[in-house]
């Protein structure tokens, strides 16, 4: 005998839709028994939840900051690269830094923005 052959009970049906009552409190079905005032108020009140923390956007300087920007203290990257040990090149949305180590090896770092 297989369990799947046994008749399954009919699914439970209900005429009580609490979410609809929250949306449309005046359209409660008349067939429900009257509840006391406190229970009705609890059903109509939305559940108390803490709001998630709001993210604040952090303003970041754009990649195209000019060398004359007075907010950058000291020499800029391009000014430092004039010493010949490393260079910075930009192309579209990428920035490439090429540097020479004291041992003579060349290191290249490319950032795709």
UniProtKB/Swiss-Prot annotation:
Q: GO cellular component annotations, sorted alphabetically?
A: host cell cytoplasm; host cell nucleus
Q: Where is this region: Disordered?
A: 24-89
Which keywords label this protein?
Early protein, Host cytoplasm, Host G2/M cell cycle arrest by virus, Host nucleus, Host-virus interaction, Modulation of host cell cycle by virus, Phosphoprotein
Judging by the UniProt lineage, the source's domain of life is: Viruses
GO biological process terms, alphabetically, are: symbiont-mediated arrest of host cell cycle during G2/M transition
UniProt subcellular location: Host cytoplasm; Host nucleus
PTM comment: Phosphorylated by host ERK. The phosphorylation triggers a structural change that enhances keratin binding and protein stability.
Compositional bias (Low complexity) spans?
24-38, 61-75
Q: Where is the composition biased (Basic residues)?
A: 46-60
The principal localisation class reads host cell
Another remark in the UniProt entry says: The major E4 form is first synthesized as an E1^E4 fusion protein from spliced E1^E4 transcripts, such that the first few amino acids of the E4 protein are derived from the N terminus of E1.
Complexes and interactors: Assembles into oligomeric complexes. Interacts with host CDK1. Interacts with host SRPK1; this interaction may favor expression of late viral transcripts. Interacts with host cytokeratin components KRT8 and KRT18.
Q: What does this protein do?
A: Contributes to multiple aspects of the viral life cycle including viral genome amplification, suppression of suprabasal cell differentiation and egress of newly formed virions. Induces host cell cycle arrest at the G2 phase by associating with and preventing the nuclear entry of host CDK1/cyclin B1 complexes. Inhibits cellular DNA replication by preventing loading of host replication licensing proteins MCM2 and MCM7 onto chromatin. Within the cytoplasm, associates with host kinase SRPK1, a splicing factor regulator, and inhibits its activity.
**Family stated for the protein in its record:** Belongs to the papillomaviridae E4 protein family.
Q: What is this protein called?
A: Protein E4
Species source reads: Human papillomavirus type 2a
